């Protein structure tokens, strides 16, 4: 396997090097400037400074303002279709989302931090609620461990969202669209130069209201309703030529409902902690040795299928995921404030100080069906999960160049203080009026204080080595995280403590210290071709389980704590941008291998009679992969592109035991298809003088994947099929008039597919899944002024 992998690396580099021959490419000369390929230059900030994508020695995908609009990327789900290799996973509902990249993910009900972290204007933001992408200048997806440059360490990658900055002239845009499912959206922004060049303001807003895709045949309500309001104020101050300040405050108020999980498959009776197939069926009479109990239950729960649990799951499969029979309330409320403040002070032409302040205040409530059926086996009741996450961060950077520009560097100090208060209600096995419902309350506060110091630099060693264009990159970061978790008085593990002999410690606390590093070598062979190799070490912080009694020690040993997850990778890549003959083109290739130790994964278990999803450490895994993307413009009016990602992720040491529960082997790897890819064609054509038309088609496809880490053992049947999605856009634009009218058709062939699920088979004998969006259409009118 390693020989095949190495041969692939050599072959890829050979192909790109061959493109440098005079017959294959029109050279534009050598030097430090970008290639004159005819393609629009793409700028990225993956190394905390602005540079061309083609000269950045890391794997990164970028969507600019125009790409976001043409592909109608307005949410996380759209982002997955635009960036193969990135998975946007839904857990309990369609509005509880997490990114997965290069095999790194976070399980539902896990207490661990996400492995792929989102950033808003360089400020790391928490939470897992779905968001709206509007008035952005770019979205960048950084792939692989991020341990030396960004606010927090991560083992999978980062998603960087950058908002549009205020302009120097009065202007802006307004956009509105209408679609099926009563989908209405209004969006706009205006630039106001309060003091020309000195004080610039931009105000943008977003409003969307739509009916959900799911129909609840029991209540007539819909799952997935959207009622979203966003407002953003950006203020840029330039008091002098060397000092600038960029302030952004973003507010979101989101209501509606969620698309809920639906039953996917069941396991045989006796395979789960709760025998739902027996309790919710005519067999209830036998279970309690009392005739008439099932009829009594049905009378108290009108609308429930009298044939029982197994028959209900089969009927749900026949109905499809958009007609549900749910007995649980469906609530979704979010109110979020996110602030970023970036001050830059240029000490000289080669030295700059940057100060980045961030603040987030995220309130949320979400309640929905858990078990995916019409029976009250497990739900959040009328409360569900209520959370408040507050975070303050401060980062001081020194950015500069020295040695005549041969050395570029970034050094900094980072501090953050975070508090997460979460109250969760689970209603389990409601057999009323025969037996009372079990209400499990989990209520706790997690505090995290992080301090870090880091530095990274790139040195041109061409003169020293005699190899033109050769440079080396090295970076390191020391992080210290103080984590504390406290169960509150009404938490199930405090109100109903464990049997004698189990010593509680409340609060629990620990300090996690780690050194992350980056070491890379890159060569700019010409203006058009960059080759690089890099190895990185990063980690995901340890912590304490929310759904576990406060027992000292790690979960694998019977305690409530889980250890840091550590990732070490090696990546080689090539980036080429030039002209093949007279045709502008761009090609990026990355090949990587990564070893993960103490992988943080969820295990659904029973602890002292309470059901819990707790984070454990799986000893080791290995991930290998290849990522390729390219664009070619055969003519000025046609652009073609394709990308593909292959991921081979395996647990290599997978056995884990938790408290009194049996040992479990983890595998296969969840949330990661082996193959994913996309192709697009973008055609522009004149209509009349001043009017231009465009037609774009995007096709995304992926192979099957698993939504449970224990599909081979505890949760069989938690595999979802691969799928192919086609999106179309037809637009007419008047550049002089400043207006555009566009029609979109998403999921054109109405493919039924699933974007995540929960492996509940070991607890409730059923696995559940969340569907992706069905076919939708919309028409947008946009005007720039």
Please provide the spans of the model-predicted regions.
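Periplasmic-side early beta-strands and strand-to-turn transitions of outer-membrane beta-barrels
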Residues: 160, 168-169, 177, 193-286, ...
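Surface-exposed extracellular loop regions of Gram-negative outer-membrane beta-barrel proteins
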Residues: 108, 255, 417-421, 494-498, ...
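Gram-negative outer-membrane beta-barrel transporters
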Residues: 29-33, 409-414, 463, 472, ...
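Membrane-embedded beta-barrel scaffold of Gram-negative outer-membrane proteins
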Residues: 342-346, 352-358, 362-368, 530-536, ...
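Periplasmic N-terminal accessory/gating domains of Gram-negative outer-membrane beta-barrel systems
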Residues: 28-30, 58-107, 116-133, 138-147
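N-terminal Sec signal peptide and the immediately downstream disordered periplasmic leader
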Residues: 1-71, 77-82, 734, 784
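C-terminal beta-signal and adjacent terminal beta-strands/loops
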Residues: 37, 539, 637, 700-710, ...
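Outer-membrane beta-barrel translocator/receptor signature
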Residues: 97, 114, 134-137, 143, ...
């Amino acid at each position: 396997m390693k020989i095949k992998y190495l041969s692939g690396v050599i072959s890829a580099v050979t192909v790109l090097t061959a493109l440098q021959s005079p017959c294959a490419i029109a050279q534009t000369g050598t030097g430090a400037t970008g290639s004159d390929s005819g393609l629009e230059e793409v700028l990225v900030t993956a190394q905390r400074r602005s540079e061309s994508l083609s000269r950045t020695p890391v794997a990164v995908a970028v969507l600019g303002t125009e790409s976001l609009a043409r592909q109608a990327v307005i949410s996380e789900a759209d982002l997955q279709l635009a960036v193969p290799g990135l998975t946007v996973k839904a857990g309990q509902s369609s509005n509880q989302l997490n990114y997965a990249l290069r095999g790194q993910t976070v399980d539902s009900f896990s207490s661990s931090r996400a492995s792929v972290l989102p950033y808003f204007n360089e400020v790391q933001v928490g939470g897992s609620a779905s968001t709206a992408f509007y008035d952005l200048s770019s979205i960048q997806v950084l792939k692989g461990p991020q341990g030396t440059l960004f606010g927090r360490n991560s083992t999978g990658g980062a998603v960087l969202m950058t908002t549009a900055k205020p302009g120097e002239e009065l202007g802006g845009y307004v956009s509105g669209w209408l679609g099926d499912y009563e989908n209405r959206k209004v969006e706009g922004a205006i630039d106001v130069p309060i003091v020309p060049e000195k004080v610039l303001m931009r105000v943008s807003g977003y409003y969307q209201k739509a009916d959900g895709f799911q129909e609840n045949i029991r209540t007539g309500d819909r799952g997935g309703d959207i009622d979203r309001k966003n407002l953003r104020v950006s203020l840029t101050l330039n008091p002098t030529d060397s000092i600038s300040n960029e302030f952004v405050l973003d507010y979101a108020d989101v209501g509606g409902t969620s698309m809920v999980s639906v039953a996917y498959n069941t396991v045989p009776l006796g395979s789960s902690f709760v025998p739902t197939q027996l309790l919710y069926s005519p067999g209830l009479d036998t279970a309690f040795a009392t005739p008439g109990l099932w009829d009594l239950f049905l009378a108290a729960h009108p609308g429930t299928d009298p044939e029982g649990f197994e028959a209900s799951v089969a009927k749900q499969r026949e109905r499809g995921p958009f007609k549900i029979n749910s007995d649980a309330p469906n609530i979704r409320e979010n109110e979020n404030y996110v602030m970023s403040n970036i001050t830059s002070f240029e000490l000289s032409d080669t030295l700059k100080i940057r100060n980045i302040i961030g603040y987030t205040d995220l309130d949320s409530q979400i309640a929905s069906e858990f078990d995916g059926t019409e029976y009250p086996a497990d739900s959040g009741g009328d409360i569900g999960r209520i959370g408040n996450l507050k975070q303050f961060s401060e980062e001081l950077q020194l950015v500069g160049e020295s040695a005549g520009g041969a050395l570029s560097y970034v050094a900094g100090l980072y501090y953050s203080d975070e508090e997460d208060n979460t109250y969760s209600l689970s209603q389990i096995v409601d057999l009323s009026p025969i037996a009372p419902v079990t209400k499990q309350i989990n209520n706790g506060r997690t505090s995290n204080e992080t301090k870090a110091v880091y530095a990274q630099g790139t040195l041109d060693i061409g003169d020293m080595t005699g190899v033109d264009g050769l440079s080396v990159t090295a970076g390191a970061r020391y992080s210290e995280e103080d984590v504390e978790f406290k169960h509150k008085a009404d938490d199930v593990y405090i109100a109903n403590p464990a049997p004698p002999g189990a010593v509680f410690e409340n609060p629990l606390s620990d300090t996690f210290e780690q050194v992350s590093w980056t070491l890379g070598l890159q060569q700019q062979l010409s203006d058009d071709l960059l080759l690089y190799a890099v190895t990185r070490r990063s980690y995901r912080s340890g912590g304490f389980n929310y759904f576990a009694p406060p027992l000292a020690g790690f979960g694998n040993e019977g305690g409530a704590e889980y250890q840091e997850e550590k990732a070490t990778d090696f990546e080689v890549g090539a980036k080429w941008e030039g002209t093949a003959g007279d045709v502008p083109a761009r090609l990026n290739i990355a090949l990587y291998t990564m070893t993960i130790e103490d992988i943080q994964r969820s295990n659904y278990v029973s602890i002292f009679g309470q059901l819990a999803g707790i984070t454990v450490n799986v000893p080791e895994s290995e991930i290998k992969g290849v990522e390729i993307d390219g664009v070619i413009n055969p003519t000025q009016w046609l652009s073609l592109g394709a990308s593909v990602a292959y991921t081979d992720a395996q647990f290599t040491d997978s056995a884990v035991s938790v408290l009194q529960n049996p040992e479990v082997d983890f595998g296969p790897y969840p949330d990661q298809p082996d193959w994913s890819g996309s192709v697009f064609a973008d055609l522009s054509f004149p209509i009349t003088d001043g009017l231009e038309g465009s037609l774009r088609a995007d096709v995304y496809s992926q192979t099957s994947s698993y939504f449970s880490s224990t599909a081979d053992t505890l949760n069989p049947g938690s595999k979802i099929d691969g799928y192919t999605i086609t999106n179309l856009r037809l637009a007419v634009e008047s550049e002089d008039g400043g207006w555009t009218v566009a029609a979109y058709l998403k999921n054109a062939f109405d493919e039924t597919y699933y974007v995540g699920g929960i492996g509940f088979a070991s607890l409730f004998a059923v696995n559940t899944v969340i569907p992706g969006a069905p076919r939708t259409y919309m028409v947008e009118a946009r005007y720039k002024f």
